[in-house]
């Protein structure tokens, strides 16, 4: 299976909180790191944290880079109660995830101290996506997890649009 398809299927299983399909994406002895909270998980612990998270949520891969050794996804995850982004670094053993390092951050307004500085500009009007950036950078549209990934990197690391089929 092509790596972009593996990652799309992985994020579908994450959003659906499907424990058994998720388990199948990981190599034996794989580990998951969440540096923001200083946590290291075994696959079973990661499955528990993900699959027992309360509520239903959605996900959209906004960007993906792929090299021979590793992949990176930027994924928006949201529900009616929250919106976050996960920057995920995947190390592979064949077609299985050997190491997943994720950085999760809340979407929201800049902190008051920075608003007072009156610097910066909005990336998007609704604040929920990086559509404007992707259109400028890749001349593409963000994709839902159920669609094709719009960009992958070549082994040299450059970004190329992938046409929707």
At which residue positions do the language-model features occur?
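C-terminal and inter-domain tail/linker signature
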Residues: 1-121
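Flexible, acidic/Gly-rich N-terminal and inter-domain linker regions that tether
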Residues: 119-165
């Amino acid at each position: 299976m092509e790596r972009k398809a593996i990652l799309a299927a992985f994020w579908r299983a994450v959003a659906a909180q499907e424990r058994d399909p998720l388990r199948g994406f990981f190599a034996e002895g794989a580990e998951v790191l969440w540096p923001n909270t200083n946590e290291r998980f075994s696959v079973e612990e990661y499955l528990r944290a993900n699959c027992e998270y309360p509520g239903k949520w959605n996900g959209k891969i906004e960007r993906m880079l792929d090299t021979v050794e590793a992949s990176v996804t930027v994924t928006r995850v949201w529900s009616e109660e929250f919106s976050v982004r996960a920057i995920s670094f995947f190390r592979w053993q064949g077609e299985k995830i050997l190491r997943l390092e994720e950085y999760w951050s809340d979407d929201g307004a800049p902190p008051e101290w920075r608003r007072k500085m009156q610097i910066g500009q909005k990336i998007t009007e609704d604040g929920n996506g990086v559509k404007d950036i992707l259109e400028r950078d890749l001349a593409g549209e963000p994709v839902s997890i159920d669609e094709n990934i719009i960009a992958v990197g070549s082994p040299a690391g450059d970004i190329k649009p992938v046409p929707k089929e």
